[in-house]
Amino acid sequence: MTGNFNTASGENNQILINLDPHTSPVNWASLIIESAKGRSTGVVEHHLVGAILQRRFKGIPVPNRHARVGSYTVSRLVCHISAAPSRNVLQKCATNVKAGLHPVLLVPREQENRAGVLAQDEGIDKELSIISIEAFVALNIIELATEESKDFFSVLQEIVQIYNKRLAEVETDLSLQIQVR
């Protein structure tokens, strides 16, 4: 990965990430997720996905709530975010399938295989989309930038701005705000 992060400095001890704007959005997403390890128990991942959904679906309200709720619903799509997938989240996905919804489980890249095994155990591996958070972030940056004729880095900065606003609205630990340079 190209770039670095510093979780001990920055304004209010925010997550400070120095990125090379010439590297790929996958690299940026990996650095953001890596920087959250040990600091948040899924809070960063949750609000990052919420920020992307808000940015992508401007005409559809994306409720902002504490990360413990753990999911977003947009139309028939239910996005579950988990830094460490468990049977509990897979049971929620199974409930979504039974209700005729399409669950998407977003997990860190290194947790994809574990999530797949748990989905098989629940019998929903064919109905559930398991996507790495890193791929979700990167693909949305690429697609939004392409649709709007913008550069990838400016779209990332917009998403981070939305993320910080959403985080400040519902969380008490503002050290989880992200500063990208």
Segments predicted by a language model, with ranges:
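Interdomain/boundary linker segments immediately adjacent to catalytic/signaling cores
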Residues: 1-40
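Catalytic core segments in nucleotide and nucleic-acid processing enzymes
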Residues: 32-181
